[in-house]
C-alpha cells in the first residue's frame, strides 16, 4: 500500500472515532435521569432491571472500544474489526435505552424534565399525606358528622387530595397539568363543612306556647277518689275535701245515682231560678272547680258544681248545683288537686304554714266512708223522712248557709259574693280527720 492511502485511512479512522465519541457523550447525557427522578422514582428502576443492566453494559462496551482504538495501528487487530464492533452493538443498546426512557415519559426536552421534577415532588408529598393510621377508624367525625365520605377522611386523618393528572397531561402538557391539579385541590379545600343541625325543640319554645294560650299553668296534678255512700250529700263531701289544704280542686267525673237535687235554672216562670227534682236520676257528668281567692288577707275557695242527670223516662236535666245533691247509690267522684302557679305558691309558703294539712293527704282523702256525726244530712234524713221536702231543704248545710246570707244570695255554688268556707258547719267531719280542728 502506498503511504498516501495509509494516511487517508488514518484520517478516516480518526473522524470515525470522533463521531463515536460524540454519540457516546450524547447517549450518556440521555441515559442520566434528572435529579427529581433519582429522588422519587427509584421504584421504576427496580421494576426494569434489564434496562439498568443494558445501560451499564453499554457504558462498559464504550469504554472497551475507546481503549481498543488507542492501541497502535500495527497490531494484530485489523482496522475493519473495530468498525464492525462499533456499528453492531450500539444499535440495540440505543433502542433499549430509548424504550426505557419513553416508558418513563422522558423525551429529553426541558419541559419534560420540569414536569418530571414537579411530578416527583407531588408524589412525595401525596405519599406522606396518604399514610394510613393504625386501628379502626372512628364512625363519627370530630365535628359530629356522619360516617360518610367527608367523615371518613376526617376520621382517618386524611386531607382531601386532588386526583393526579394523567401521564400525557403531566409530561406532555408541562406546567398546565400541575396547575390544574392545584386548582382542583384548592376547590376541594375551599368547600366548607355542612352546618350542624340541632335536634329537638328549641329551648323556651314550650313556655312560649303556654304563654300564648293565656293564664297560668298549674303544676303537681294529683288525682283523688271520693266515695259517697247512699243518702249522703255529694256537694257537702266535695266542699269538705276542698277545705283540707291550699291546693286547687277540679272535679273530673262521677258515677252513680242521686235522688234529690236542687238546680239553678232561671226562666220566666220561676224568677228565683231554683228548681228541685225528686226521684232517681243517673249521673251523666259532674264537673266544677274550686280555686283560692284572697281578699282582705283572708284566703277562701270559690267555685261551683255543674251536673247533668238522666231520668227513668229518658228525660235529661242539668244545671248548676244550688243546694243539696243527695246520693241515691254508692257514688264515686274523681277529683284532681294541683297548684295553680308554682311561683306564687313559693312566695306564699310562709302563709301556707299556718294552714294545717294532713301528713298523708291521699290516704285521708280516700277515707270518706265513715259515718257522719249527729248533724249529718243522712241522720237528719232518717229522722225526718216523713216530713216535707221544705223541711229537708232547711236542714241541709248548704241551704242553712244560704239562709244566713241576704235574700239575693243563691248559695255557695252561685255567682254571688264568695264567703269563707269556715262559716259552713263542719262538725260532722271531726271524726274523719283527727287532729285537724275545723276552721
Curated annotation (Swiss-Prot):
Transcription factor that specifically binds AT-rich DNA sequences related to the nuclear matrix attachment regions (MARs). InterPro entries: AHL, AT_hook_DNA-bd_motif, PPC_dom. Gene3D superfamilies: Hypothetical protein, similar to alpha- acetolactate decarboxylase, domain 2. Residues 9-31, 79-95, 376-386, 403-416 have a biased composition (Low complexity). This is AT-hook motif nuclear-localized protein 13. GO terms for molecular function: minor groove of adenine-thymine-rich DNA binding. Keywords: DNA-binding, Nucleus, Repeat, Transcription, Transcription regulation. It is found in: Nucleus. Pfam families: PCC (PF03479). The lineage of its organism: Eukaryota, Viridiplantae, Streptophyta, Embryophyta, Tracheophyta.
